[in-house]
């Protein structure tokens, strides 16, 4: 590669193309490929690099706690999970249809791992996603009420293609927090998908969200376009013999 060409690629921020140029040129000369095929190979390498960088950026923004993967989930240790059903969810048809997914089960059965694995699949397919623990979400809602930034918070969360709310359970909530959560779910209703992991059945949501009529309306929206998966199996956190 000439110094001029290297500088041009550097100025254009075509890092990957600059890194593979000599290798691809040598391979092209040996294989006697056409100029267009050679250029296509360079552009393809640059494109893949951009895609990988964009994915890493989206993953960082999504706040995934760990790089959970559906491929590495210990299905053999969790008979309560229907692997075929999870594979169907991994096709992301529920995201395309703006449907919700609620994973219900005791602590440690793998709800978060499966949910994060599905969120990663969505990220890999270019969707805007975010992971948030329920306690952190409600804390953020309370802080937004204090500084009058609720509308900004709702706008940010409502436009996400997939919002994963983890550990949705008994929390000490003020009525204003419950109201804000209802508004969020109302704005996401049949527009975007929400994944919720919880150890509570739907009949227990009234106990911590408060206002019965509001919770009934919330459940109507959450469950209308929704897949509910109940995981009844052993804890994956138990020591392995």
Task: Please annotate each region the language model reported.
Residues 4-7, 20-27, 72, 100-104, ...:
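Short hinge/gating elements
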Residues 62-74:
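Conserved adenine-nucleotide phosphate-binding loops and their immediately adjacent elements
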């Amino acid at each position: 590669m000439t110094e001029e060409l290297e500088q041009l690629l550097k100025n254009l921020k075509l890092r990957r193309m600059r890194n593979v140029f000599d290798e691809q040129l040598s391979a092209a000369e040996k294989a006697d490929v056409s100029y267009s095929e050679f250029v296509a190979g360079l552009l393809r390498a640059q494109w893949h690099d951009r895609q990988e960088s964009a994915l890493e950026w989206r993953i960082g923004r999504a706040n995934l706690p760990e790089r959970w993967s559906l491929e590495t989930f210990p299905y053999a240790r969790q008979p309560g999970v229907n692997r075929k059903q999870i594979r169907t969810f991994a096709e992301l048809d529920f995201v395309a249809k703006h449907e919700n997914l609620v994973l219900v089960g005791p602590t440690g059965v793998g709800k978060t791992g499966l949910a994060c694995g599905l969120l990663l699949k969505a990220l890999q397919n270019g969707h805007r996603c975010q992971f948030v623990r329920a306690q952190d979400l409600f804390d953020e809602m309370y802080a937004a009420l204090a500084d009058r930034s609720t509308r900004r918070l709702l706008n940010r969360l409502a436009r996400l293609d997939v919002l994963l709310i983890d550990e949705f359970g008994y929390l000490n909530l003020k009525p204003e927090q419950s109201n804000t959560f209802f508004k969020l779910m109302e704005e996401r209703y049949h527009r975007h998908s929400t994944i919720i992991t919880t150890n509570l059945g739907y009949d227990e949501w009234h106990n911590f969200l408060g206002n019965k009529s509001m919770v009934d309306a919330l459940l109507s929206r959450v469950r209308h376009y929704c897949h509910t998966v109940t995981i009844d199996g052993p804890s994956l956190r138990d020591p392995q013999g």
